[in-house]
Amino acid sequence: MMAGSTTTTTAAVRVRGAGRAFAGRQVLRGVDLDIAPGEFVALLGASGSGKSTLLRAIGGLDRGFTGTLEAPRSKAIVFQEHRLIPWISVWRNVVLGVRGRDLAARARTALDEVGLSAEADAWPATLSGGEAQRVALARALVRHPDLLLLDEPFGALDALTRLKAQALVARLWQQHRPAVLLVTHDVEEALLLADRALVLRDGRIAESFDITVTRPRSVVDPEFSALRRRLLLALGVDPDAPTGAQS
């Protein structure tokens, strides 16, 4: 059984020997993973490799695992779908499930951090896709998580909105410094945001890349380009192929 969510003094997340099978198919096989407090880790791999499965385990959303897991009690998850409730206002979505006083003020503070304080009383249906994802980020931030789990949060956004959302996440991470696990298919996104990029292959963490490129990062930086090439090769993608072949 997976161990209950607990805090650890040496790592924000500690996974040992995690395994998961669905209908007889082994998706994860003895995964080991450590994420330090305040570290930003990106997890990449082919579709169906188990990236989101591992994230859900760390988030406490799936108990059908073998192995052991330690993670902070204070954690929040942002999915690709914003999952806002349409019949309550934006600010009430932000603090849904949060206890304590001054919830409206706390919601507005979180919305201000993502540039949406003016939309606090709006209905979710009036928001663009990018705005809705920013509300989802505010909903995570208002909980002051020690661990932020991002499951392809920009996957449904257009290219320009995606770049703006990436920059926002980078800024918010630098401000609040939670540990972050980002599941993504986008190599450049991983290299722009993370301290470390992991490749999940055959049910295990097959490769790990330390990203030492100075922030803020640029895709035209030669060091960035060299690391991008190595990471694409690790993912089984030809880095010299046309861009469309890498998506």
Curated annotation (Swiss-Prot):
Question: Which Gene Ontology cellular component terms are annotated?
Answer: plasma membrane
| Keyword set, alphabetical order | ATP-binding, Cell membrane, Membrane, Nucleotide-binding, Translocase, Transport
Q: Which SUPFAM superfamilies match?
A: P-loop containing nucleoside triphosphate hydrolases
- EC assignment: the record states 7.6.2.14
EC main group: translocase
Reaction(s) the record says it catalyses = ATP + H2O + aliphatic sulfonate-[sulfonate-binding protein]Side 1 = ADP + phosphate + aliphatic sulfonateSide 2 + [sulfonate-binding protein]Side 1
Q: Which GO terms describe its molecular function?
A: ATP binding; ATP hydrolysis activity
Tagged with keyword ATP-binding:
yes
Q: In which domain of life is the source organism classified? A: Bacteria
Q: Which residues bind ATP?
A: G45, A46, S47, G48, S49, G50, K51, S52
Query: How does the UniProt record describe the way this protein sits in the membrane?
Result: Peripheral membrane protein
Q: Where in the cell is it found?
A: Cell membrane
Q: Which Pfam families match?
A: ABC_tran
Q: Kindly indicate whether the keyword ATP-binding belongs to this entry.
A: yes
Q: Where is the ABC transporter domain?
A: 13-227
Family of this protein: Belongs to the ABC transporter superfamily. Aliphatic sulfonates importer (TC 3.A.1.17.2) family.
What the protein does comes down to: Part of the ABC transporter complex SsuABC involved in aliphatic sulfonates import. Responsible for energy coupling to the transport system.
Q: How does it assemble?
A: The complex is composed of two ATP-binding proteins (SsuB), two transmembrane proteins (SsuC) and a solute-binding protein (SsuA).
Q: What is this protein called?
A: Aliphatic sulfonates import ATP-binding protein SsuB 3
In which organism is this protein found?
Nocardia farcinica (strain IFM 10152)
Instruction: Tell me the classification of the organism that encodes this protein.
Output: Bacteria, Bacillati, Actinomycetota, Actinomycetes, Mycobacteriales
